[in-house]
Amino acid sequence: MLTQTPARSNPSSAVRYDVYRLARLYTLPEVLSAPWWLMARLWIGWVFFVSGLTKIADFDTTILLFADEYQVPVLPPEFAAFSATAFELICPVLLWLGLGTRLAAIPLLVMTAVIQFTYLAHDQHLFWAIILTGLIIHGGGKWSADHLIGQRLKV
């Protein structure tokens, strides 16, 4: 004996099934949002962390680069080198954890702007700036410590 599925035998259930499928498709951006923001945090954090490791590996050369090559305006080269290295090593860890994501992304965005406008204009910096701006606006996403803390505090 052949039986038909309810979606095929009853037109109203077919419509409900189609509406259900459309509703699930509508939530797809929300479903993909959490992994997207996690990947964005991991990737941009890695970019800056590797840069910080490079700076700390030979800090004397880093200071010379800040004094002669980068010529950062306003700040003394030693302070600029130290603070850039510290931000490049601390902020990525915060981004990876999703802890204080917005605050961690701000110094990295400022550094990106300084690099872009004072030293080396490069298209890649625009991509970094877009991701960091998104993290500042959106936050770390559902897969972040910020989200877990917010859930606990009901913020």
Describe the function of each predicted region.
Residues 1-60, 74-90, 96-155:
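Extended, low-polarity transmembrane helix blocks
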